[in-house]
Amino acid sequence: AIVAVDQLTKYLAAANLVGKTVTLIPGWLQLHYITNDGMALSLLRGARWLFVVMTAVYLAVVIYVLVKKWFKKTPELWCIAAITGGAIGNFIDRISTGLVIDMICIPWFSTFNVADLFITFGALFLVIYILTKDKELLADKPKEQKKPHDADA
């Protein structure tokens, strides 16, 4: 579903937003069509095949991890699904055209797409979940109380 929503929004942006900017919240949120051959914030521009290889390796690792059932809890699986769906959405663009379509613009920050949102929030929530899932690991463990030694034994 993530891949479908991502690809649909990219299709709609390409069909309706080329050369246009639609302001949704002045100064904060716009829809604006651009293409990007890099990653978030236009980093590593022109590295199409690096991203293709990195995504293919990521997908292979995810398949291995899922087969091994290392992630067993629902929150972990939802986060992995979000990251993977976003990665596949951008992977499709890179394979087919070499460019990723971005359309969600925060004027003072960046322009990105639905896949980027799922990758970012999936990764963020996964880190938060991992850091908070076992509160005993983060909390100070109570010190063991010494038992009085029985001198009569």
Q: For the regions a protein language model found, what residue spans apply to each?
A:
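Alpha-helical transmembrane bundles and membrane-interface segments of multipass inner-membrane proteins
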Residues: 1-153
